[in-house]
Amino acid sequence: MNTSFTHPEFADHERVVFVNDKAAGLQAVIAVHNTQRGPAIGGCRMWPYENVDAALTDVLRLSRGMTYKNALAGFNSGGGKSVIIGDPRTAKTPALFRAMGAAIESLGGRYIVAEDSGTSPTDMAVIAETTTHVAGLESDSSNGDPSPSTALGVFLSIREAVSFRLGRSDLLGVRVHVQGLGKVGFELAKLLVSNGAVVNASDINDDNCRRASDELSIRIVSNDELLTGNCDVFAPCALGGVLNEWSIPTLNTSVIAGAANNQLLTQEDDLRLANAGILYCPDYLVNAGGVIDVYHRRQGNSQENTDAGVTAIADRLNSVLTEAQSRGISPAQVAQERAEDLIRGPQNDPIPTVAA
């Protein structure tokens, strides 16, 4: 196994913590990538990783992406992530999440956790029994689930990218392939259908497919058909690494914009997409709606602040796409430059809030 320092995904991470609590059945990795702008915020993913090295690879990549995501959103926060090795369908126990909370508490506030793939607001409530450094909890005004905000940000980004690339002012008849029908993917498909898009989708979970077919009347296809079929927009909303040297030559789309993190398997895949004439909208820009939701609720800000923050994603994307076009470089390069400039610069003033 690679050590943290020699791991190919290690990118000057500040802290990488391996957690092993046998009594609680917990094996986890917490990665704090950068706290230049403030405490690291990022979700806790639970997944049945094949081994610890796979978990380490994922958490290192995800935490770096959170640094960029939070910087572009203008937050006084850095990037971090945590992963629990285990099947979320069978391995969840209160003891496991309490142990995870204790591990997070030991970092002294450097990392603030929230839900992610495989975890829920209910799990965050158990984590909160042993740490105060948790966001995305249920309240009187919110169920704690940020996925609708994530889906809305992706939807607005798709609409913006379709306008930019295809010159369309609406989504009527636009063909969108949605990969993944979990909480975010389903909400995205729902928004797309309600705005006239023609949606095909795939998911490894048969129940998710049946629900989407029954409730949204969308066409369910195989993952291979989804990747290779002709469409206007491909929206990856499952796990990362789907855009790679093997899949990119098979894609038949004009735009890529989705909710999945780490959609590019390598940095070279951005160039492959550009050479293929495909407009790739950087994932950490497009899918920031969830962390925007979590951030504003933790700050005690109003729903209007969250709504304004999510809506601003489309404007930010347009700015990135316009600059990329004028400079003859990819949108991912522009987004990375902007994020790194923000990370190197002084911490922002507190985000202005909208009166409730």
Language-model features: locations:
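Rossmann-like adenosine-cofactor binding region
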Residues: 206-285
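Adenosine-phosphate binding glycine-rich loop
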Residues: 162, 254-355
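Flexible, glycine/charged-enriched surface loops at secondary-structure junctions
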Residues: 70-75, 110-115, 166-174, 223, ...
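N-terminal ligand-binding/catalytic initiation module
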Residues: 1-140
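Glycine-rich phosphate/diphosphate-binding loop of Rossmann-like nucleotide-binding domains
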Residues: 145-233
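Hydrophobic beta-strand scaffold residues
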Residues: 111, 199, 220, 279-280, ...
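Buried hydrophobic packing segments
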Residues: 59-62, 154-162, 291-295
